[in-house]
UniProtKB/Swiss-Prot annotation:
Residues 1-60 form the IBB domain. The keyword Ribonucleoprotein does not apply. This is Importin subunit alpha-7. InterPro entries: ARM-like (IPR011989), ARM-type_fold (IPR016024), Arm_3 (IPR032413), Armadillo (IPR000225), Importin-a_IBB (IPR002652), Importin-a_IBB_sf (IPR036975), Importin_alpha (IPR024931). The modification Phosphoserine is found at S6, S113. It comes from Bos taurus. The gene is KPNA6. Forms a complex with importin subunit beta-1. Interacts with ZIC3. The keyword Ribosomal protein does not apply. Functions in nuclear protein import as an adapter protein for nuclear receptor KPNB1. Binds specifically and directly to substrates containing either a simple or bipartite NLS motif. Docking of the importin/substrate complex to the nuclear pore complex (NPC) is mediated by KPNB1 through binding to nucleoporin FxFG repeats and the complex is subsequently translocated through the pore by an energy requiring, Ran-dependent mechanism. A motif (Nuclear localization signal) lies at residues 45-54. It holds the Pfam family Arm_3.
Amino acid sequence: METMASPGKDNYRMKSYKNNALNPEEMRRRREEEGIQLRKQKREQQLFKRRNVELINEEAAMFDSLLMDSYVSSTTGESVITREMVEMLFSDDPDLQLATTQKFRKLLSKEPSPPIDEVINTPGVVDRFVEFLKRNENCTLQFEAAWALTNIASGTSQQTKIVIEAGAVPIFIELLNSDFEDVQEQAVWALGNIAGDSSVCRDYVLNCSILNPLLTLLTKSTRLTMTRNAVWALSNLCRGKNPPPEFAKVSPCLPVLSRLLFSSDSDLLADACWALSYLSDGPNEKIQAVIDSGVCRRLVELLMHNDNKVASPALRAVGNIVTGDDIQTQVILNCSALPCLLHLLSSSKESIRKEACWTISNITAGNRAQIQAVIDANIFPVLIEILQKAEFRTRKEAAWAITNATSGGTPEQIRYLVSLGCIKPLCDLLTVMDSKIVQVALNGLENILRLGEQEGKRSGSGVNPYCGLIEEAYGLDKIEFLQSHENQEIYQKAFDLIEHYFGVEDDDSSLAPQVDETQQQFIFQQPEAPMEGFQL
């Protein structure tokens, strides 16, 4: 990601940081690592595969109950697929072909466990369905065969592979140009299921040249269900990190996604935002392409959407964009993102609060004007409250946001953070078991102590005003304990801080602390301050 940042910018940033241990490269690398971790998490809002399960009307109920009776009997070893069904499927009579394909489709639409394996293990059946896809003179047969194959492809990777190996994908792509909307929509659905299976399947579908016909369909369609399915399929084509899709093969969808962001349909908006979040997840060149498509202002507006399934992927996309360079980050700030992010910090959903903190941490890793913008938006008081009270995974992100600001901020900006009370919650993080966050907290405290040392020299008193605040927060005891930490960087940093800023070590200051497993941190006996106060 560093390649897009100008050398001049990096040199300026290096000089402006008070803490060379947390330089711009480290912060940028951290954003990548954190981003990967966030994107590995399971998303309940979006399914990568969808089965088409019909809503049964009364007229079909009797036939379906008979089918289900035969299906239930198959659990005793009797096959649900009869020899007669297979013979009728291979009949030359179009009416028999249609009726039997419909029977198979109904079986494959049953919840909760359709007999997919039995269907694909019956010789010739899947190939016959694929053959029926080519019957342009019989759109109903095409539709039923496409539906059956869609539900087979909604299963396991092995089941999806059977559909691919039968040669269905190029034919499904041709059917995107069908004159019949039902056939088009079912083809889109099948292709979405196949692309959603794995990066290998996704790339195969892309290499079969799906994008142009899919985008044409998206541009022309006036049917909401069709557009929803097409955007969902498109998001599956953009999804994945190991490896990501070839950007040149998916980036032509950006203008269409830009237009779709103005839909009023929540399902459609959610998948369009997920697609943009995937496309913006990567190096600065990808981020720039997303910015150039003109989506930023609308993405920021969607942060305030009343449906979390839209706000969440919009936040992910905005968060990815601000992992870029300072100029790219500024584009988001110029869209008035900070008031929206402040609003999201009080979301009822913990995952949204966490990602809002993560996004802000990438903004505070920017330049001093960007840190000031976060200050002016009154975000830091809320971040410090989160740092004290939230779930640990959210506290971690808030810690990054505050430490990044102490690393790149001006003396006045750091003093502002101290005035808000950032020292105590940073000291509290010194007892957690996550070594990376202990280092983040130590770096933040070191930046504050370094400023205090400069202020002591400037005032002529030689007294660092922040040493006392850290001692009052029992930070010194915790730093002393960290001198025996198993992580070399942590114990070295703790030793250096005590030696440089606190002078004499107090050997009796701490006994080995207990461990609180539920809070993922160590427990200290808090010593009472001596009557005359702490010695500086």
